[in-house]
């Protein structure tokens, strides 16, 4: 094995041998070419070429960074083939593609409400937990959603600059949109799902036999307890007696409407409403084109049924009532029942003379 000194000596010998071969080949190159020999009296400094003169013979080899930049292929970006929005990564296109579908893969474990994005599910969970993580730095008020906190901050500041300064600690830390190069290659595509969608279970429709379903609704407080009519009237009387701001009959009727004699559930999202009209209005606006799973649906009661047998049994009740009305066995009550108007003496006894005069004005009845 050669030592380091022997290796250097061998490299020096090979260099001298190459130089001698070059000189011999130059001398015998041709008779027409002049051969210049080294003058023994020439100083070594004269043999050295000036650095400035030598620079003109250097070849312009590009630097490493210049080679990489020149040899790089144009960057590819991804464009949605539905709305033409451009994303710098395919992952971003996949996350965006769910907007153009009806898929809501992220479901709440408590109320089974579904969302398109996981961030929306995280915000929704605070409805059940009561967690209010966003606190106002001025008054300490806490908010469930960050957007509500920004609205609240406007009550403490007067200018836009102050609002931006107060909102800066709570602002999102997402990266700003990236600039798209001019020579970028645009790849159009649908993106496909970013996740593996689980099999969507069919929603269990309301039926007559499934006690577990009704027990769950009772535990969640979806069903109101059974209250006697006398208790409901007593609550209405207490509301009237404790509310001294009544001035018109219309106000009294509005208060009476708030008593929930019966609730109606939306057949799609199971939201509760006090009246059938509110339930129908909600279903028309929020679920206009959603008729999936409503094969056995009563339009009169606005309720779905689990199977055809339950639906037919329910519809037979409507048929029976209609036949009883046609035969005169049942007399339908008017839509607007008669109102028992108290006398002036009764109003004066309850609220005083001035209040009784206001309530008994003919144009307000």
Swiss-Prot record:
Keyword Nucleotidyltransferase: no
Disrupted gene: phenotype observed: RNAi-mediated knockdown causes ectopic expression of gcy-5 in the ASEL gustatory neuron.
InterPro entries documented for this protein: Znf_C2H2_sf, Znf_C2H2_type
GO molecular function: zinc ion binding
Principal localisation: nucleus
Cellular compartments annotated: Nucleus speckle
Any GO CC annotation of this UniProt entry: nucleus
Protein name as it appears in the record: Zinc finger protein lsy-2
ZnF (C2H2-type) intervals: 78-100, 106-128, 134-156, 264-287, 296-318
């Amino acid at each position: 094995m050669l030592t380091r000194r022997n290796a250097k000596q061998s490299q020096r010998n090979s260099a001298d041998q190459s130089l001698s071969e070059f000189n011999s080949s130059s001398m015998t190159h041709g008779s027409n070419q002049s051969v210049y020999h080294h003058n023994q009296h020439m100083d070594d400094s004269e043999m050295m070429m000036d650095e400035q003169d030598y620079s003109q013979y250097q070849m312009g080899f590009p630097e490493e960074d210049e080679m990489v930049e020149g040899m790089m292929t144009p960057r590819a970006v991804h464009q949605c083939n539905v709305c033409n929005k451009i994303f710098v990564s395919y992952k971003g296109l996949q996350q965006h593609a769910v907007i153009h579908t009806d898929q809501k893969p992220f479901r709440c474990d408590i109320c089974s409400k579904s969302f398109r994005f996981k961030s929306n599910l995280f915000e929704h969970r605070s409805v059940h937990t009561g967690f209010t993580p966003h606190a106002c730095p001025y008054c300490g008020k806490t908010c469930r959603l960050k957007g509500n906190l920004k609205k609240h901050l406007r009550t403490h500041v007067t200018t836009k600059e102050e609002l931006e300064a107060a909102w800066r600690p709570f602002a999102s830390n997402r990266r700003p949109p990236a600039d798209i190069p001019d020579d970028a290659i645009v790849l159009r595509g649908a993106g496909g799902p970013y996740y593996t969608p689980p099999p969507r279970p069919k929603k269990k429709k309301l039926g007559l036999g499934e006690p577990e379903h009704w027990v769950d609704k009772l535990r969640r407080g979806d069903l109101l307890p059974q209250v006697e009519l006398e208790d409901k009237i007593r609550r209405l009387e207490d509301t009237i007696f404790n509310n001294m701001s009544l001035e018109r009959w219309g106000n009294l009727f509005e208060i009476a409407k708030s008593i929930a004699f019966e609730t109606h559930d939306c057949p799609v999202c199971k939201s509760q409403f006090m009246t059938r009209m509110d339930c129908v209005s909600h279903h028309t606006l929020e679920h206009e084109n959603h008729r999936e799973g409503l094969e056995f649906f009563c339009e009169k009661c606005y309720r779905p049924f689990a199977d055809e047998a339950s639906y037919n049994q329910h519809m037979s009740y409507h048929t029976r009532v209609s036949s009883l009305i046609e035969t005169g066995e049942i007399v339908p009550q008017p839509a607007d029942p008669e109102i028992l108007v108290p006398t002036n003496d009764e109003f004066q006894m309850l609220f005083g003379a001035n209040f009784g005069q206001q309530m008994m004005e003919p144009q307000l009845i």
